[in-house]
């Protein structure tokens, strides 16, 4: 975590104060400040978003820890607001938001992003940060991006790319690429799909009726902690041959993470507008 601590020391005082208010979450094998590190990455990514000060932002897939929600609320300022949409995985969301001091800017909405309970043009910008991989396939993703473009005239999409330039990025991908296969075998659900190339993100936008304005790749250079999952999940898979193959892959990925750590892959960013 030395790079995170160095980046934090170099950050604006307001950013340090914001992250200091984010609670420490001891979640082995992660360090207690893993959530603060992830939020710093989101702040980096959102510097590339066309956010308006005092604007209204719709976030699709705010998740259980408000990892992008709180940075969004910080960026829009005290007069802005974030409509935080999430279907079911609220977890510690409300407690983390309350501790951050951003609660008056954040409006959580329980909803299915395929049918957003919002009028047309309810927001200035719709965003999905590191969430496309959880939208359960291309058809679903297109439908949700289409809804985002109905609720806001512009969208901002950011997602990790299937690129590894360092051993620590390779360690992340080795574990992350197991998630889809393991979850499908263990529960029959397809969640955390493999990362898609930047061109695929752009094609999703175009299929949803959007027009790409800009595309870029961002190098983050920060640790990442969200690929790891318990070995016991693999141990519960019934088909013996499949279980053994996946256990071997899990052990190899875990060994890589212990040796090299785990870093964010490059992040693909797409900004688009409604046609």
Where are these regions (language model features)?
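Class I SAM-dependent methyltransferase Rossmann-like catalytic core
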Residues: 7-43
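Conserved class I S-adenosyl-L-methionine
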Residues: 156-181
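Conserved alpha-helix/loop element of class I SAM-dependent methyltransferases that forms part
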Residues: 35-54, 71
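Conserved Class I S-adenosyl-L-methionine
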Residues: 213-275
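Short alpha-helix
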Residues: 192-209
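A short, conserved alpha-helix within the catalytic core of class I
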Residues: 135-147
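Class I SAM-dependent methyltransferase SAM/SAH-binding core
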Residues: 58, 63-115
